[in-house]
C-alpha cells in the first residue's frame, strides 16, 4: 500500500515499531549488530524526549551552528523568470556550509550519551565528512571518515578541512570509488569498532534507527522554514517545496515542516546525470526497483540479476544507487523529477550571477527544477527551495570542466 498524506502528526506515525516505512526500511544487518542497533533506537527515543538533551541540542544549534538559517526571497531571479516567486532556505549558511551538521551534532550528542568515544561515517562531496569532523572536535570525540578516491580528488579542499579538524580520512579504491563504496567501507569499520564507536551515517539511509535519527535531527530545517516563510508571507504557506534527493537527509529535513499540509506540493529532484542510459545517472526513484542496500529494504538501481548498478552525477553527494526508506514510502505523496548535469550547471551559474549565492551542485539540481516550475506557475504562487549547501567545493571543478 502506498502512503497518502493526511491531516495529522506525521512524525508519530512513522516508522512502525519494526523500523518500517510502509514496506520499506527494517533491519537487514548481521545478528551481532542488532542488539547495538536496538540500544541505539532506545537511546535516541529516550534522549529525544529528555529536556536536558533537548537543551544541549538547542544550545548547539544556536551558539555553535549559528541557527536559525534564514529564508529569503530571490527577488532578482523571480523577476527574470516572471512566474511564481522563489524563496530559499539557506542551509548553505549553516556552520560548515551545508545541512549535514544538523544530524552530525545530533549523533555526537548521542555518542556521548551512550559513552561512545568515536564517530565513523562515509562522505561523498565531503560536506558530511567536514560536518562530522567539526562535531567530533566540538564534543571531544575521535572521528573516522571514509571517502571514495574519485570523490577525494573532486573534494580535496574538504578533505583538507577534515584533517585540520583532526579526523582520520580513509580513501576507498574499490568499485566506482564513490559514495556507495565509501558507505560499504564505513559500515565494515563500524562492524569492527561498534563497542566504542557510533556510525554517524551520512543520510536518511540504512537500517532502523538510522533513517529516523537523521530525519529527527534534520527536521529543524522544516520547522524553521515553516515559521520563517509564514512570517514573511502574511501567514501563508508555500505552494511548492523543492529539495534535491539522494539518500534523503536534506529532503526529509525540509519536508518535515510540511508533510501534514495537504495544500503544499512537495517535490524531490534526482540527478539524471549525463543521460537516462544505465550507468549515466543516479535517478533511483525514476528508474529503480525494490531491493536491499546497506541494511535496508528500499528502491535501488540494479540490473536484472539484482547487482547494484553503476551511477553517475556531476554532484558527488548524489552519486548513490539507492534512496532512503522514508523517501521510498513517500513516492506517491511527493512529485519526483530528474534534472541532468547541463541543467544543473546552468542553474549553478544563474543563481550565482543573479543573486550572489553560489550553490552546491547538489542544491543546484533543486534550483534548476524550481526555475522551470516557476516559469509555468501563476505569479501568485510561491516556491520554497532548500539550498542544502554552498558551492565552494564545486567552483574549481565547474570552471575547469563547464564553460559558462
Predicted regions and their residues:
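Glycine-rich ThDP/TPP pyrophosphate-binding loop and its adjacent helix/strand module
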Residues: 180-189, 196, 205-263
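Active-site/ligand-binding loops adjacent to catalytic centers
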Residues: 183-209, 213, 263, 268-357, ...
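Buried hydrophobic positions in well-ordered alpha/beta secondary-structure cores of metabolic enzymes
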Residues: 26, 70, 88, 100, ...
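Active-site-proximal loop->helix
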Residues: 120, 128-186, 277-288, 394-403
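A short, small-residue-rich loop immediately preceding and capping a beta-strand
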Residues: 95, 103, 111-148, 236-250, ...
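Claisen-condensing/thiolase-fold acyl-transfer catalytic domains that form or cleave C-C bonds
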Residues: 245-249, 341-402
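Short glycine/serine/threonine-rich phosphate/pyrophosphate-binding segments
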Residues: 97, 101-107, 121-139, 153-156, ...
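Positively charged, low-complexity intrinsically disordered leader regions
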Residues: 2-25, 32, 38-116, 345
Amino acid at each position: 500500500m502506498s502512503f497518502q498524506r493526511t491531516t495529522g502528526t506525521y512524525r508519530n506515525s512513522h516508522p512502525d515499531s519494526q523500523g518500517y516505512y510502509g514496506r520499506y526500511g527494517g533491519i537487514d544487518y548481521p545478528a551481532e549488530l542488532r542488539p547495538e542497533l536496538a540500544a541505539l533506537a532506545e537511546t535516541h527515543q529516550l534522549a529525544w524526549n529528555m529536556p536536558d538533551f533537548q537543551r544541549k541540542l538547542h544550545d548547539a544549534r544556536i551558539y555553535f551552528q549559528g541557527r536559525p538559517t534564514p529564508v529569503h526571497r530571490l527577488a532578482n531571479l523571480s523577476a527574470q523568470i516572471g512566474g511564481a516567486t522563489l524563496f530559499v532556505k539557506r542551509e548553505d549558511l549553516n556552520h560548515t556550509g551545508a545541512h549535514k551538521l544538523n544530524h552530525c551534532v545530533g549523533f555526537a550528542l548521542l555518542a556521548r550519551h551512550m559513552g561512545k568515544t568515536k564517530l565513523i561515517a562515509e562522505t561523498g562531496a565531503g560536506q558530511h565528512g567536514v560536518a562530522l569532523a567539526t562535531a567530533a572536535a566540538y564534543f571531544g570525540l575521535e572521528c573516522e571518515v571514509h571517502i571514495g578516491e574519485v570523490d577525494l580528488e573532486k573534494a580535496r579542499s574538504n578533505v583538507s578541512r577534515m584533517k585540520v579538524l583532526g579526523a582520520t580520512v580513509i580513501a576507498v579504491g574499490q568499485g566506482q570509488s564513490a559514495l556507495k563504496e565509501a558507505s560499504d567501507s564505513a559500515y565494515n569499520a563500524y562492524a569492527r569498532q561498534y563497542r566504542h564507536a557510533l556510525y554517524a551515517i551520512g543520510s536518511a539511509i540504512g537500517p532502523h534507527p538510522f533513517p529516523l535519527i537523521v530525519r529527527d535531527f534534520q527536521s529543524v530545517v522544516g520547522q524553521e522554514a515553516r515559521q520563517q516563510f509564514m512570517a514573511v508571507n502574511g501567514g501563508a504557506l508555500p505552494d511548492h517545496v523543492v529539495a534535491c534527493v539522494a539518500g534523503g537527509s536534506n529532503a526529509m529535513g525540509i519536508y518535515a515542516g510540511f508533510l501534514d499540509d495537504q495544500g503544499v506540493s512537495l517535490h524531490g529532484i534526482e540527478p539524471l546525470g549525463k543521460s537516462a542510459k544505465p550507468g549515466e545517472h543516479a535517478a533511483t526513484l525514476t528508474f529503480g526497483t525494490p531491493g536491499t542496500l546497506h541494511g535496508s529494504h528500499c528502491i535501488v538501481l540494479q540490473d536484472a540479476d539484482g547487482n547494484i548498478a553503476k551511477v553517475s552525477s556531476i554532484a558527488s553527494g548524489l552519486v548513490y544507487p539507492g534512496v532512503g526508506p522514508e523517501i521510498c514510502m513517500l513516492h506517491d505523496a511527493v512529485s519526483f523529477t530528474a534534472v541532468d548535469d547541463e541543467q544543473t550547471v546552468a542553474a549553478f551559474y544563474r543563481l550565482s550571477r543573479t543573486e550572489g549565492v553560489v550553490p552546491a551542485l547538489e542544491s543546484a539540481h533543486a534550483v534548476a527544477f524550481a526555475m522551470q516550475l516557476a516559469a509555468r506557475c501563476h505569479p501568485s504562487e510561491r516556491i520554497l527551495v532548500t539550498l542544502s549547501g554552498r558551492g565552494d567545493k564545486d567552483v574549481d571543478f565547474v570552471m575547469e570542466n563547464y564553460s559558462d
